[in-house]
Each structure stands twice: as structure tokens, then as C-alpha cells.
A protein has these predicted regions:
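Mixed-charge interfacial surface used for oligomerization/domain docking
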Residues: 1-4, 10-169
């Protein structure tokens, strides 16, 4: 059998969307090369932003220094991070839960085709974010729990959103 590797440069909800799209293309009778080519194109339309409340796991994984963690904890800062070319990149900072959710929701364009809200233990916050996105985008937002591996690296209070940009006409 033939194999084609597609590096999604993504995780969690973004990866979920690409895997689901691959399944749809398989079910529609797509060939291996057609499916891989479409996924290579579509992966550039998928985005993921996320945030955490507790900065300790970011410090332990080397993504944040001790001083920055201490100051961030005192000021109730919650970093907004994004996945860019397969790497976790700092985007901006928020203070408190309300601003954290507002800033995450602000990243998603109103015409997003598909939206996923990811969380591990923060179900209430995830539901609030999903409601905000449903109002803003008029789209059905899927809630998904992410696995413990992300929890180990980012913290179990991680909350994020992934979406697919609307297709160009």
C-alpha cells in the first residue's frame, strides 16, 4: 500500500478537523494523492489559539521563565498562545477569565466554516466561549476535550479554539 505523509503542523481541534476532512474525502472515494493534496491546501486555513490560567506547567516545560511566571501569577495574567507552523507562539496577554475568553473569541473570524472549542477541566469556561462564538459567527461550535498529553505540557486548565477559515470563492 502507498503512504503519503501530511504534516498538519497542528494539534487538538485543528488536527481533529483535518482528520475528519480526510475521512470525508475517503468516504467520497478520493484517491490517496487527491486527499493528501487537499489536506496540504486546507491545513493553511486551520488556526488554533489557546490560553491557560496556571502558568506553572508552562514554566516546567521551558516555555516560560520563573520571573515571568511569578509576575504573571500576581497580575492574574493569562497568555494567549497560538500554533504557528507547528510551534507554540506567544500572541498576547489577558487578565482574568472574562478578558481571556473575549480575546480568544476575537481571534475567530465571523465567517469561519468550522469551529471547535477545546478544554480539559474548564467545562464552564469552554461553554461560555462556545456561546460567544455561536453568537458572533452564527455557526455550530463543537466542544471537545483534549487529551492528557496536552494537559501535562500546558496545564489541565487549558482552553482554546480552533477554526477553519472560509474557503476562497
Amino acid at each position: 500500500k502507498s503512504i503519503r505523509v501530511v504534516d498538519s503542523r497542528m494539534t487538538a481541534g485543528g488536527l481533529f478537523m483535518l482528520v475528519r476532512r480526510a475521512r470525508e474525502l475517503i468516504d467520497a472515494g478520493g484517491t490517496l494523492n487527491d486527499i493528501a493534496d487537499k489536506l496540504e491546501t486546507e491545513k493553511d486555513r486551520v488556526h488554533t489559539y489557546f490560553s491557560v490560567r496556571d502558568l506553572t506547567p508552562l514554566r516546567r516545560s521551558g516555555r516560560l521563565g520563573l520571573v515571568r511566571q511569578s509576575v504573571g501569577t500576581i497580575l492574574n495574567q493569562r497568555p494567549i498562545l497560538k500554533i504557528h507552523d507547528g510551534a507554540v507562539v506567544y500572541y498576547e496577554v489577558s487578565r482574568g477569565l472574562n478578558e481571556q475568553l473575549r480575546k480568544l473569541a476575537a481571534r475567530v473570524p465571523e465567517n469561519a466554516e468550522e469551529i471547535v472549542v477545546e478544554y480539559i477541566t474548564e467545562a464552564q469556561a469552554a461553554n461560555r466561549l462556545a456561546e460567544m462564538l455561536e453568537k458572533k459567527c452564527g455557526a455550530n461550535v463543537q466542544l471537545r476535550k483534549v487529551g492528557p498529553v496536552l494537559g501535562i505540557h500546558l496545564g489541565f486548565d487549558v482552553i482554546g479554539t480552533s477554526w477553519k477559515d472560509a474557503a476562497e470563492q
